[in-house]
Amino acid sequence: MKGNIKALILALSAFTCVASAQSINIEVLSATVKDKKIDDATVILQKNGAQSVTARSDAAGRAALNAPFSVDQDSLLIIKKEGYSDLVVKCPCDGMTYAVSPVMKSLDGMRIVLTWGEKPFDLDSHLIYPGNHVYFSHKKGRDANLDVDDTDSFGPETITIDKKRLGESYIYAVHDYSNGDKANSLALSASSAKVFVYVGSSQVRSYSVPLNKTGNIWTVFRLNPNGDFEDINAVGEADFSKAKDGNALPMVLNPAQTAVSVTGNTALAKSLNRDGEAAYGRGELEQATTLFLAAIDQDSAFGQAYSNLGLAYQKRGNIAEAIWANRKAIALANGSNAATTRASSYYNIAKIYENAGQFSDALQHYELARSQKSNTVYDKAIERMNAKK
């Protein structure tokens, strides 16, 4: 009798494992070359408390993973390839196409990559900044261009900014071209659209389209004049036919372009940040960076996480990313030490520019540092930059 019961328990356990197992199939493409398949990319599926599953993409860019766990919103997919930025995305991810971004060399560059599901067939990326509107009908703007345009599901659509200009605002939005005349459509909200933002060799932000919202335009984020991200992440309606150029488009986007607070899990963010500090202390810089970014995903106003992230980036030699993190620290500075924090961050950015030989940019940021706080170090740096003109 006991033997029969034991056999039954083993059978049920085996059935449970099979039932919870899940097969995940994805495709990996280049973010900058249309339809280029990426082979030999390492694809990792992770979930807390479970053993990671790893696969490699084949010549067609396809990768299949058999997960011994249920793949849900608590699961992470990570794609790694030499010469490309790591891609990190929350699941569900089965049947999706992901595009990896080649490492960028510009200190002031940025790449924005859009992917989505099978429907709608055509989503379009739009980048709007003073005097410029980069999209499918106008693929090149000042220091920015549409690298890849996709009209038959999945994406990617990629916009690269070669040089962000301090003092100018940039708005990035996604238009549901397939349902462009249907302001009450739910198709965009149900598209599984995701936006990935890259600086240097790192993915620094990611966004998922809000669910159960009607509209044909997803206004994702704004880069403010200081170069800081302002999360908008709102779905609404817009008539892009009225936008003949970049000067007209803000009028079209006006109902949706006000930055909103993005809710997150503050307690989880603090926990992830502590884990990141521990990893940093052990010298595990890659893991620390991942944890600090995860903390920021949970709380986009977490200043300490950005400060820690900047240190990790600098230690790893990720200079462009260090600039981005310092800009965010400037934006979040508050309290009695705010001026000191801003001055220090401007100085850090200036030193990076000076070391790269970008002396006019360095001078501008040394002057910004001095505008926040008097310091003979800043005075001498300004003299040094003026002598190089």
Label every PLM stretch briefly.
Residues G49-L65, D150-T151:
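Short, acidic Ser/Thr/Gly-rich low-complexity loop/linker segments typical of extracellular
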Residues A50, S70-P92:
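A short, solvent-exposed loop/turn motif at the edges and junctions
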Residues Q22-T42, T115-K119:
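Structural motif
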Residues S261-Q298:
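Alpha-helical segment of the N-proximal tetratricopeptide repeat
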Residues R274, N308, T341, N348, ...:
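Canonical tetratricopeptide repeat
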Residues S101-T263:
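Intrinsic-disorder/low-complexity signal
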